[in-house]
């Protein structure tokens, strides 16, 4: 195994986002082979919240969500979509509730999703059809929010599947495991990114933050990964039916 390549893959930090003071467009980044992110440039996020938060407080309130079958679903309501454009908001309550519970309260909006079918490294980004498909949907979601409510930053974290043997640089099995829900690796990446944006003194207010997801271990749920993710991150958990009042 190419140990140097593995080290390089795991040494990439999610907070390593270019500080471009005039840029607001989110930046896609591939982290080794275990995660991809779509994050606003640091100065852009800091500028957005500058006049919205209490200057005396160093606590950040986060509203975090799973993506598929929580915020969105396929256009026909079937389990698997037919492409990156085959999506819609899960129901008509999603946007009004986000506006009320996230935007009005000036929370940081975050999506955490497991995408094990997407296997990608930086070198293979241009030839990975599934990665290209993955990068389309969050952009359309953000555009839909912006069109209705004006610009509001949306942070996106996706854990990705292991590449086939011989593909480098690749992350270790341990890193893949720790960044896949229900493990809390992606939450830790969010914490590092926010500290980079606002300063090392800032902390997520875990009592006032939460995670919403459909994989709660109920009868009919495919997994309990979302519930376990919230527990491992130390934040309250809600299922979409309760959060959106369905």
Regions found by a protein language model. Name each.
Residues 85-97, 122-142, 184-189, 224-225:
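Well-ordered, non-membrane alpha-helical segments in soluble/globular domains
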Residues 135-179:
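A short, structured active-site edge motif that brings together acidic residues
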Residues 62-92, 114-125:
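Metal-dependent phosphoesterase signature
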Residues 178-223:
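Conserved Lys-Pro-Asp/Glu-containing loop-to-beta segment of HAD-superfamily phosphomonoesterases
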Residues 78-85, 119-129, 166-180, 217-224:
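Short, flexible/disordered intra-domain loops and linkers
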Residues 1-67, 75-79:
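Non-catalytic pre-domain segments flanking phosphatase-related domains
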Residues 210-246:
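Acidic, Mg2+-coordinating phosphoryl-transfer loop and its flanking beta/alpha structural elements
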Residues 94-134, 152-165:
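Substrate-recognition element of Asp-dependent hydrolases with the DxDx(T/V) motif
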